Amino acid sequence: MESRLTEREEMVRWQIEARGVKNPRVLQAMRSVPRHLFVPEPYAREAYQDYPLPIGNDQTISQPYIVAVMTELLSPEKGDLILEIGTGSGYQAAILVACGASVISIERIPAVADLAKRNLTRAGIRNVLVLCQDGTQGYAEKAPYNGILITAATPALPEPLLEELADGGRLVAPVGDRDIQELTRVTRNKDEYHTERFGAVRFVPLIGMYGWKKEW
């Protein structure tokens, strides 16, 4: 147990904080969530290294630095309601909860949704509702959302998600073509949307009605 705590602290210090992530809430969340419980057992020893790892079904858990950056761009606060598109392992949702948010997370692959539920339960993470459906269509039942986080590559920002963003809310997503995307943040001000871009990234595809029609 002590070694895992040390690994997490080293991960935050050298992979995240040293590379410019400063939000105290995000740093504490990254220190507190046991990432090794969200990766397959064969990769548990690599859980705190700064690279993505496979979780099955051609999906991955993002590298810790990218998780921290996307969370900082979203800047979740205590009491926020966050919509996550692409649950994956459940790790990103756990980080959002550790920041004080409640999360609705949508995953399109049933086996991956089940994996995330098991991982979240094993890690003792509550305040996450995992749904299995097309996340590009949003989830109007609980809208509007203080933040929306898309954890897969989208060719454009899905219109339903923009509509479900609360006034003052932020949407963070990798937007671009099949080879490379730009990490993008959109902030809503009533009926206007302010867009900022934060550099190149590469993610697995966002499949759905308002995403890519098929994987590549």
From Swiss-Prot:
This is Protein-L-isoaspartate O-methyltransferase. Pfam families: PCMT. Signal peptide: none annotated. Belongs to the methyltransferase superfamily. L-isoaspartyl/D-aspartyl protein methyltransferase family. One of its GO terms (molecular function) is protein-L-isoaspartate (D-aspartate) O-methyltransferase activity. It is found in: Cytoplasm. InterPro entries: PCMT (IPR000682), SAM-dependent_MTases_sf (IPR029063). Catalyzes the methyl esterification of L-isoaspartyl residues in peptides and proteins that result from spontaneous decomposition of normal L-aspartyl and L-asparaginyl residues. It plays a role in the repair and/or degradation of damaged proteins. Keywords: Cytoplasm, Methyltransferase, S-adenosyl-L-methionine, Transferase. GO terms for cellular component: cytoplasm. It catalyses: [protein]-L-isoaspartate + S-adenosyl-L-methionine = [protein]-L-isoaspartate alpha-methyl ester + S-adenosyl-L-homocysteine. The active site is at 62. Its EC number is 2.1.1.77. The keyword Cell membrane does not apply. The keyword S-adenosyl-L-methionine applies. It comes from Methanospirillum hungatei JF-1 (strain ATCC 27890 / DSM 864 / NBRC 100397 / JF-1). The gene is pcm. One of its GO terms (biological process) is protein repair.
